[in-house]
Amino acid sequence: MIRTIAIVAAAAATLIALSAQAQTAVPASRLPSGKIYLLPATLETTQWGWFDNAQPPVLTIDSGDTVVLETMMHSHNQVVPGRTIEEIKKLRTDHPGRGPHTLTGPIFVNGAEPGDVLKITINKIVPRAYATNFNVPGMFGQFPDKYPDGQVRYMYLDLDKMETEFLPGVFVPLKPFPGIIGVARKEPGRYSSVPPGEFAGNIDIRDFTEGASLYVPVFVKGALFWTGDSHAAQGNGEVNLTALETAFKEFNVTLTALKGVKLEWPRIETPTHWITMGYDADLNLAWAQAQRETQKYLGEQRKLSAVDAAALLPAVSDCRVSQVVNVKKGIHCLIPKDVAARGIPERPTTETAALYVTHAKNANLNTAMNDASMAMIKFVEEKRGVARLDAYGLASAAMDCRIGDMSGAEKNVHCVMPKSLWRK
């Protein structure tokens, strides 16, 4: 089968005909039906730190077409092996208000109009061979006052084994996904790449990987699609500010404008689950929004009243703290597509055979998250003998913080760390 592939250069596009099968290793079930465009990441096809509706599109496609694009490392590829933490901090302080992320785009989707929904399906992800994790000294992250000294660590990504040796003898599994992905806001003007919102953006949901689709409301003509902040792996919490930050050599996505679909807030579909999400500077309000979105989905999926959907939510929704470092903190909930499914993954309060566990509860979810995550960082530091900044970074890359019992006034947070990360 022959498909048309468009290669997009800085100033022009050239069409060539090639076999789709020869170009990618995407499974046949995920091969697109439209044209395939190639979009390299260059200074002409990327923006650093801002969304801006006035930015001219770098590529125009039809609904249902596929784009095989590249992304850059932070700050227009300036955060690469060899950069010191002092240099990384200066990139932030010299550009106040600007996010650190390099965004590929915008891509204009013909036919996408305000009120539509853009479906973004990830077909394939190929990261670069390295990643970085850093905390900027005394700035950002969950605990900037407790970590006034910063650190940057670079690591090789073993794409054959799909793991990286984060520390000597400590291996983190790779699960590549886009930290930032979304469309233009309805409001004009520049907007920092850091806070997420109704347009998606910096959602940092690690379950949004190959084979999953993001559905996001369209606010401007053409939708204007961007992506960046590419991750090789991330913990649920991303507490020290960064995941395993990388760039993608290939990010293969199909963009489809959906007509007649009502959606007010982003939602993700995986092969087995739907994922709802909530964002706010206050984690309590992010949690409240995630609950509302989950109840709304359960009502739609199972034809339930609002009261019945709220009652079902604790039995079927697996809710995690996506991140607490993007100005607006995030919580996402996984709901099984199987309507008969009941039960949620383990939420232990004490150590298990497979997991290190910390647990905290408080009427204020921000406090519960702070206490549970700091307890895990301290545990890794004191019990596993990991240096304090390394423990902070490892928690950001591999800790999984989950929302626990929802029945009482106190909120429960369970943070877990797989023991399998450590190899003797």
Name each model feature, range by range:
Residues 8-17:
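Bacterial N-terminal signal peptides
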Residues 29-95:
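N-terminal, Lys/Arg-enriched amphipathic/low-complexity engagement segments
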Residues 42-52, 96-104, 191-199:
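Short, structured beta-strand/loop micro-motifs enriched in basic residues and often containing a Trp
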Residues 74-85, 125-135, 222-232, 323-325, ...:
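Short, Lys/Arg- and Gly-enriched loop/turn segments at beta-strand edges
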Residues 80-98, 130-145, 227-244, 347-350:
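Short, compositionally biased
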Residues 124-209:
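Intrinsically disordered, low-complexity linker/loop segments enriched in Gly/Pro
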Residues 178-202, 206-284, 295, 341, ...:
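Conserved mixed alpha/beta catalytic, RNA-binding, or beta-rich assembly cores of soluble enzyme
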